[in-house]
């Protein structure tokens, strides 16, 4: 099934140059007077090699049909991440290198979709947004309002995002999983 490059998301499985690749990160860039393009970080599922590729916005991307099974993230143990099938309660574990940047959004009991190709788990698809708790940031300013000023905040998963100055430690925020950006308070 062909989709435009602009609809590519982290966690998708695509066919590129005749081989299966997992999409790890996607960045839509629009440099000055030039045409917009999509900079994607891909991992070859056969060899495990990581590389970046630049797609033009209208380029058709062949999304591979995989078995998508709804699962719930349970916990991680080092580089192993454990998921439970919500239909039959079977557990599956995936390695950190299979998950890529998606590990920065995984919290206990998060409902996700795990993709299987030929019976082997090849990646996950995250929800559009996740709610994460701020564990470290600079103190908030009194009477701070939303503006173009931001500060870095470390979230419970280790992800660092730029947040407005009124966000304090311990607050839950909503983060966009495609961009890795702050959206709002939860």
Curated annotation (Swiss-Prot):
GO cellular component: cytoplasm
Pathway info: Protein biosynthesis; polypeptide chain elongation
The keyword Protein biosynthesis belongs to this UniProt entry's keyword annotation: yes
GO annotation terms (biological process): peptide biosynthetic process
Single GO term (MF): translation elongation factor activity
Keywords: Cytoplasm, Elongation factor, Protein biosynthesis
UniProt cross-references to Gene3D superfamilies, sorted A to Z: 2.30.30.30, Nucleic acid-binding proteins
Superkingdom, natural source: Bacteria
Compartmental location: Cytoplasm
Pfam families, alphabetized: EFP (PF01132), EFP_N (PF08207), Elong-fact-P_C (PF09285)
Job of this protein: Involved in peptide bond synthesis. Stimulates efficient translation and peptide-bond synthesis on native or reconstituted 70S ribosomes in vitro. Probably functions indirectly by altering the affinity of the ribosome for aminoacyl-tRNA, thus increasing their reactivity as acceptors for peptidyl transferase.
NCBIfam families from the UniProt entry: efp, PRK00529.1
Family that this chain belongs to: Belongs to the elongation factor P family.
Name of the protein in its database record: Elongation factor P
Biological source species: Acidobacterium capsulatum (strain ATCC 51196 / DSM 11244 / BCRC 80197 / JCM 7670 / NBRC 15755 / NCIMB 13165 / 161)
Gene: efp
């Amino acid at each position: 099934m062909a989709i435009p490059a602009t609809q590519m998301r982290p966690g998708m499985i695509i066919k590129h140059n005749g081989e299966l690749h997992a999409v790890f990160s996607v960045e839509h860039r629009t440099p000055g007077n030039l045409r917009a393009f999509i900079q994607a970080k891909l991992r070859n599922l056969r060899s495990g090699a990581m590389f970046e590729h630049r797609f033009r916005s209208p380029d058709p991307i062949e999304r591979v049909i995989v078995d998508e099974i709804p699962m719930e993230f349970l916990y991680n143990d080092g580089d192993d991440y454990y998921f439970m099938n919500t239909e039959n309660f079977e557990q599956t574990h995936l390695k950190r290198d299979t998950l890529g940047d998606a590990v920065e959004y995984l919290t206990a009991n998060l409902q996700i979709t795990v993709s299987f190709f030929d019976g082997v788990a090849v990646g996950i698809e995250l929800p559009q947004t996740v709610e994460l708790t701020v564990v470290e940031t600079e103190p908030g300013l009194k009477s701070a309002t939303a503006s173009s000023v931001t500060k870095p905040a470390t979230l419970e998963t280790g992800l660092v995002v730029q947040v407005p100055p009124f966000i304090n430690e311990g607050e839950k925020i909503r983060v966009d999983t495609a961009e890795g950006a702050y959206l709002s308070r939860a």
